[in-house]
């Protein structure tokens, strides 16, 4: 099974920079003029120093991908870490005056077995082999497509580009400050928010033919007094064999949260509102297998 070789950042950052940029310079599209090369070098150095400070380690291929986004002028600079989890790290970056979120999947710690389960049931993808590289690239491509589709229908960040295990999307926040999660909000009009969220779930299902798959108060941000759905990595199309079990779980999560806010909510009613159908007991039983 092919796999990326995880290489820690060198103690001498200059050596690391030299090696990575030497590899980049071998590619024709990254033949940069001297001044821009110098500018990029300083940004790369700061990025590596920030990674070292945060005890973040990426394999060489991932660093090459991140640096190529600077060299190719897809991004202006990386600013800092927004969120760090077991399977992915989200960075804040800029593209000119616009902020971007850069999601980097950790090659060494991703749950490839779970990823395969979600990808293989999606008719948009046909994995003939199951190498780690193919799986993670398909996973990023799937999230990219899901975001593109969702952002046309509901409040969700627009995906800008994807490259290997890296996904670039719009940053949800205020002047570079991340928007708060729904779980951290106080004194909102909870009835209003529940109504907007259930309408968004319905539109996503009917118009986008998508099920979020991991929807909860943790994956909904609040910006301009509106909910914004994020993290579409587990989202599936409605034809996927796990679509309805995942939708039931989403309905349970949302109703559990809003009931704590004293909003009258029943997950079976929410599911019927979204799909127009009663819950199939077989689908509900499958939740335990997710």
Curated annotation (Swiss-Prot):
Alphabetized GO MF terms: ATP binding; hydrolase activity; metal ion binding; protein serine kinase activity; protein serine/threonine kinase activity
Active site residues according to the UniProt entry: 214 (proton acceptor), 231 (4-aspartylphosphate intermediate)
Positions with a binding annotation for ATP: 82-90, 103
Recorded superkingdom: Archaea
Record-annotated Protein kinase domain positions: 76-290
Enzyme Commission no: 2.7.11.1, 3.6.1.-
InterPro entries registered for this protein in UniProt: Kinase-like_dom_sf (IPR011009), Prot_kinase_dom (IPR000719), RIO-type_Ser/Thr_kinase (IPR051272), RIO_dom (IPR018934), RIO_kinase (IPR000687), RIO_kinase_CS (IPR018935), Tyr_kinase_AS (IPR008266)
Disulfide bonds: none
Pfam assignment, any one: RIO1
Keywords: ATP-binding, Hydrolase, Kinase, Magnesium, Metal-binding, Nucleotide-binding, Serine/threonine-protein kinase, Transferase
Signal peptide, first to last residue: none
Binding, Mg(2+): 219, 231
Catalytic reactions of this protein: L-seryl-[protein] + ATP = O-phospho-L-seryl-[protein] + ADP + H(+); L-threonyl-[protein] + ATP = O-phospho-L-threonyl-[protein] + ADP + H(+); ATP + H2O = ADP + phosphate + H(+)
Family of this protein: Belongs to the protein kinase superfamily. RIO-type Ser/Thr kinase family.
Chain's role: Despite the protein kinase domain is proposed to act predominantly as an ATPase.
Protein name: RIO-type serine/threonine-protein kinase Rio1
Gene name of the record: rio1
């Amino acid at each position: 099974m092919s796999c990326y070789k995880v290489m820690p950042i060198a103690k001498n950052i200059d050596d690391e920079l030299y090696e990575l940029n030497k590899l980049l310079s071998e590619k024709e599209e990254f033949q940069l003029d001297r001044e821009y090369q110098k500018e990029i070098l300083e940004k790369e150095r700061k990025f590596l120093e920030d990674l070292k400070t945060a005890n973040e380690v990426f394999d060489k291929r991932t660093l090459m991908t991140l640096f190529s986004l600077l060299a190719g002028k897809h991004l202006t600079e990386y600013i800092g870490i927004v969120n760090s989890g077991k399977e992915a790290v989200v960075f804040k970056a800029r593209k000119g005056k616009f902020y971007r979120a850069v999601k980097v999947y950790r090659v060494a710690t991703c749950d490839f077995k779970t990823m395969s389960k979600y990808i293989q049931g999606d008719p948009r993808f046909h994995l003939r082999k199951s190498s780690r590289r193919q799986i993670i690239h398909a996973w990023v491509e799937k999230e990219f497509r899901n975001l593109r589709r969702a952002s046309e229908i509901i409040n969700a960040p627009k995906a800008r580009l994807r490259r290997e295990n890296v996904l670039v999307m719009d940053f949800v926040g205020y002047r570079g400050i991340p928007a708060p999660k729904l779980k951290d909000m106080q004194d909102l009009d909870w009835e209003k928010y529940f109504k907007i969220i259930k309408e968004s779930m319905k539109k996503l299902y009917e118009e986008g033919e998508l099920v979020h798959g991991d929807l909860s108060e943790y994956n909904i941000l609040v910006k301009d007094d509106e909910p914004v759905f994020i993290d579409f990595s587990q989202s599936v199309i409605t034809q996927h064999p796990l679509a309805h079990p995942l939708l039931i779980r989403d309905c349970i999560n949302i109703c559990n949260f809003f009931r704590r806010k004293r909003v009258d909510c029943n997950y079976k009613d929410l599911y019927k509102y979204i799909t127009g159908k009663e819950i199939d007991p077989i689908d509900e039983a499958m939740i335990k297998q997710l």
